[in-house]
Design a protein with these regions (language model features):
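Short helices/loops that flank or line small-molecule/ion binding pockets
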Residues: 77-84, 104-105, 205-214
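C-terminal motif of bacterial Sec signal peptides marking the signal peptidase cleavage site
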Residues: 16-18
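Alpha-helical, coiled-coil/dimerization segments enriched in small aliphatic residues
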Residues: 56-59, 67, 141, 175-202
Length: 285
């Protein structure tokens, strides 16, 4: 029974103490190894619970002052163990051995996929329970559902056909966002139809496939890469017509966090500028 208390009850007690400002050291609190979850903790008004972050966690700006405890989904065990947090949160990509080591040390570990709207809802509900902010979590769930319903209603009433899109995550090898990925989900709400329909996740594809599918637009997420200097891209119609869209803040589209709904709205606005109503393909009468 004492062992059960140590592993299940004590971390929660420490966490609540940390969030209420009762701790005098780094003991207690939350380590987030996921940028989306770091953003969610802050959005729910519990930034004071955070004691460390991953190197990929960079928003809001204030979290950059926190110490790092590893890379995205890759904990630095010794550093985390020295911090003695109450809770570590991340997606499911954390090595099970690392997660077990943290649990054996009495640290609660919450791992769950973080890839789409349903996962986001699940994390909001979990954080509401874990961080003792049920009202804030309920409010965020209502906001998320309302934004999704708003986008879906706009799609239903749209006169234009969905634009066929390619999402470039990396250019060499050519990695794209497949079916059921987060870019696929947010793109659909922005009025895009993914040309990659059968492969899930983030598959590697060929330029020959892209030429054959002939997308209307390319959404370019490959930082520091330039298609203009690569002759292989010059035969693609979207490149020839300068319909390659580089999101101003792609992290809002690539992270399943509270900012993704604003990211969808921004993507819709960018597409509207690129494809004015008089040039967009219309739906059949």
């Amino acid at each position: 029974m004492r062992r059960l208390f140590r592993f299940l009850i004590l971390p929660v007690v420490l966490l609540l103490a940390a969030c209420s400002g009762e701790k005098e050291s780094a003991a207690g609190g939350v380590v987030s190894l996921s940028p989306a979850l770091t953003e969610l903790v802050c959005h729910l008004g519990r930034e004071d619970c955070l004691v460390a972050r991953s190197t990929a966690c960079d928003w809001p700006e204030s979290v950059k002052s926190l110490p790092t405890a590893g890379d995205f989904a890759e904990p630095e065990l010794e550093r985390i163990l020295a911090m003695k947090p109450a809770l570590v949160v991340s997606n499911e990509f954390v090595n099970p051995k690392d997660a077990d080591a943290l649990r054996q040390a009495g640290i609660a570990v919450e791992l769950h996929p973080c890839d789409g709207f349903d996962d986001y809802r699940e994390w909001v509900a979990r954080m509401g329970r874990l961080l003792d902010c049920p009202d804030e979590a309920e409010s965020e769930l209502k906001r998320a559902d309302a934004r999704i319903a708003e986008f879906e209603a706009e799609l239903k009433n749209a006169k234009e056909k969905p634009l066929r899109a390619l999402y470039v995550i990396w250019d060499s090898p050519l990695l794209t966002a497949g079916a059921d990925s987060l870019p696929d989900a947010v793109g659909r709400l922005a009025g895009l139809e993914n040309i990659v329909k059968t492969e899930k996740g983030y598959p590697s594809i060929s330029l020959e496939f892209v030429l054959k599918e002939d997308p209307d637009v390319i959404v370019w997420f490959a930082h520091g890469k330039d298609w203009k200097s690569n002759p292989s891209w010059h035969g693609i119609r979207a490149v020839q017509t300068n319909r390659v869209l580089i999101p101003l803040d792609d992290s809002a589209l690539l992270r399943p966090g509270p900012r993704m709904f604003d990211g969808i709205a921004d993507l819709k606005a960018d597409l509207k500028k690129m494809f004015p109503p008089e040039t967009a393909p219309e739906t059949a009468p």
